[in-house]
């Protein structure tokens, strides 16, 4: 089955797994998904992720979810830029998520970065999602 929004599918899988208190969730692999997961790992929202090859040419990502005293670390994870409506932001116009308590994940010319990393690198880009 072809997905129209693979990144939205990953975010929904993470959201549903955390609501069900699962330790891990599985998603089909892609470079964009792996880069977003790497940004979430750097920001401390997930424990990590691994790539598993099911058969030659077909891989999946196993995401290790993070909990704090039994509560999910990710309270809210939403898609901002969608296939039908792309959202781009200059770094000066990028709003802070919950007054800096959350992060935005951006696709920039320097790769997929959190809003804090993008501000430090002084680059804007497509706002992929918000995490709190």
Curated annotation (Swiss-Prot):
This is Small ribosomal subunit protein uS8. Part of the 30S ribosomal subunit. Contacts proteins S5 and S12. The keyword Nucleus does not apply. NCBIfam families: PRK00136.1. PANTHER family: 40S RIBOSOMAL PROTEIN S15A (PTHR11758). One of the primary rRNA binding proteins, it binds directly to 16S rRNA central domain where it helps coordinate assembly of the platform of the 30S subunit. It comes from Granulibacter bethesdensis (strain ATCC BAA-1260 / CGDNIH1). Signal peptide: none annotated. Coiled coil: none annotated. Keywords: Ribonucleoprotein, Ribosomal protein, RNA-binding, rRNA-binding. InterPro entries: Ribosomal_uS8, Ribosomal_uS8_CS, Ribosomal_uS8_sf. GO terms for biological process: translation. Gene3D superfamilies: 3.30.1370.30, 3.30.1490.10. It comes from the Bacteria. GO terms for molecular function: rRNA binding; structural constituent of ribosome. One of its GO terms (cellular component) is ribosome. Belongs to the universal ribosomal protein uS8 family.
